[in-house]
């Protein structure tokens, strides 16, 4: 009797191996062979689930974004717009090991996106969705004298910068959270 294989789980296993490589050694170290070694499987298995490196890279990025989205939605328990915005932005900052790894990976993907239009498109769409959500919450909060779209873009830029400061250990976590709170 043939074994039933969960193809999604196998693809996620391989994507997790890719993400570990990206977080520790950078995306330039990602290859089908390196991912296979990291996952403890054959290169043939990787090729079975992903035809190309770009297909694997896109899947892994989508998986990271889905995880960030799911964690952010779970953390947004308030109905107060300002608290919703704060909850979302705190989930993006590298304040624990999981988020540090995700930030390392997303940062590597930004560099990769400079030469890969498909990756750039995925990052652009994720940022646009986040900006729309933030702008909607700012509108709901009735923020005076603010253009919600510009304010949302500014908050995302702030969090990106704070993330870099945290990753490079130029700011302590408490300082980054205080800087974010000062802008809210």
Model segments located where?
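Residues in soluble alpha-helical coiled-coils and helical-bundle/repeat scaffolds
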Residues: 51-55, 76, 80, 97-101, ...
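Amphipathic alpha-helical packing segments from all-alpha helical-bundle domains
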Residues: 69, 98-107, 117-142, 153
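Short, basic, alpha-helical segments at the C-terminal edge of helix-turn-helix-like DNA-binding modules
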Residues: 62-68
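Hydrophobic alpha-helical connector segments
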Residues: 59, 73-102, 148-155
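Amphipathic C-terminal alpha-helical segment
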Residues: 95, 108, 112-115, 155-174
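N-terminal intrinsically disordered/low-complexity leader segments
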Residues: 1-9
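Helix-turn-helix
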Residues: 13, 17-55, 59
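C-terminal peripheral helix-coil segments that are non-catalytic and often amphipathic
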Residues: 1, 131-139, 154, 158, ...
